[in-house]
């Protein structure tokens, strides 16, 4: 839907001197999500308390299945793990952000890849899966992570909107951690 996340990922990769590979994954045919369809609007709220726990219109069908299918790329590059920043605590209603999803997909990699059947499967690592947003912010700050390069907003403007579910959960996490968010937001957030 927008290139802002790709720009952010590139900056984070450069910060860590990591290889940055862009894989084209056109999901625009998935018309039921506000993140892939130009016909649906990303919901806007005034506070994180308005974010519902049911499956929202921003759910992209099988998105993490598609992302984790890139285990083949990891295997072909000689890697042994895929790190994914999924989070289930401040749950946004996404079924593919739950521990049982990642456990099931790990079983798929164990039996469905060459390295898996040879006893050394690509491991799915979910380091922040059980952490609150505030815990994530505190850990990232402690580790010196380049939070100024991270992007959570579902919209692709120059500044984060501050009103989509993702922005509100991020802002809540920074507020609860007592740390200023280095990302710029539209208006007076």
Where are these regions (language model features)?
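ATP-dependent adenylation/nucleotidyltransferase module used to activate substrates
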Residues: 1-143
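Short cysteine/histidine-rich metal-coordination sites, predominantly Zn2+-binding motifs
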Residues: 156-157, 177-189
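Hydrophobic residues in alpha-helical segments
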Residues: 128, 174-175
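Mid-to-C-terminal catalytic subdomains of enzymes
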Residues: 84-91, 146-162
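Local cysteine-cluster metal-coordination motifs and their immediate loop/turn environment
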Residues: 65, 69, 73, 151-172
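Short amphipathic alpha-helical interaction/hinge segments
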Residues: 113, 175-178
């Amino acid at each position: 839907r927008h290139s802002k996340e790709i720009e952010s990922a590139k900056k984070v990769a450069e910060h860590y001197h990591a290889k940055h590979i862009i894989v084209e994954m056109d999901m625009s045919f998935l018309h039921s999500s506000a993140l892939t369809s130009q016909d649906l609007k990303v919901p806007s709220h005034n506070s994180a308390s308005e974010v519902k726990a049911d499956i929202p219109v921003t759910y992209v069908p099988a998105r993490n299945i598609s992302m984790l299918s890139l285990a083949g790329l990891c295997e072909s590059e000689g890697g042994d793990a895929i790190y994914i920043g999924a989070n289930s605590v401040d749950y946004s209603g996404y079924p593919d952000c739950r521990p049982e999803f990642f456990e099931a997909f790990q079983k798929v990699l164990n039996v469905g890849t060459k390295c898996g059947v040879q006893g050394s499967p690509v491991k799915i690592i979910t380091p922040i899966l059980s952490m609150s947003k505030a815990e994530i912010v505190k850990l990232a700050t402690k580790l010196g992570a380049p939070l100024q390069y991270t992007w959570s907003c579902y919209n692709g403007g120059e500044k984060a909107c501050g009103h989509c579910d993702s922005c509100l959960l991020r802002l809540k996490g920074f507020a609860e951690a007592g740390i200023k968010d280095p990302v710029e937001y539209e208006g007076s957030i």
